[in-house]
Amino acid sequence: MVVFAVLITITVVTSRASIYTGISGELASIAEFNGGEIQSGFDTVERAALGIQDYIGRLYSGQVTEEGDADLQQSTLYPGRALTSAAYNLEQFVVETARNTVKNTPEIKMLGVMFEPYQLQSDMEEYGFYVTMDTADTSIHIYDAYEGYAKEDSYRIPAGEGHPYISQPYQDGDGMVVAYGTPITYGGRVVGVVITSVD
């Protein structure tokens, strides 16, 4: 009897240790995989921000030629708002960059581009929008006021401190996401921020 009790105890302890090791290993693998996906999303957003930053630099240094700068064009996102050719071309570039990034990167649920007051154009205090994975082909969501995006940590911290921001994971719908914001700089100052939610 005592022998059976000892064998049962040894079996239970050994089984428990094996199960614990197996579960720990599986959870570590899942965490490593998820971490890799999140890092991939961050890298994609960094590339998008650097592409926008590079375009702004080329635009304002004259490397991107602007025909008809005196002609104002209607904003695609803000109906009734007239944009200079430079601002219009920048709008087209950032909208397509955001759309394509969301459509081609499954781990990115949302991507937005927001500018500091009067940085897209000298008579526009606010300019910000975001694209979601679900509506990338059909609609773009705009912010009507600077305050609408300026208070969000993913904008406020990169804009104010000049470095990327990563939130703690939070529940969004049926999954966990991480918010990420990275500054767009020109001439040594922050002119805007690219933000995203990474699955």
What are the residue ranges of the model-derived segments?
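Juxtamembrane extracytoplasmic/periplasmic/luminal helical "stalk" adjacent to the first N-terminal
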Residues: V3-Y88
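Extracytoplasmic/secreted envelope proteins and their assembly/folding machinery
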Residues: A28, E46, V95-R99, E152-Y155, ...
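Amphipathic alpha-helical bundle/coiled-coil segments
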Residues: Q39, G148-E152, G181, S197
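Short regulatory alpha-helical segment in sensory/regulatory domains of signaling proteins that mediates
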Residues: Q39, G57, A98-P106
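Extracellular/periplasmic ligand-sensing ectodomains of membrane signal-transduction proteins
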Residues: R81-Y88, T101-H163, Q168-G175
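Solvent-exposed, extracytoplasmic
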Residues: V94-K103, V193, S197-D199
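Conserved beta-strands of PAS-like sensory domains
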Residues: D174-D199
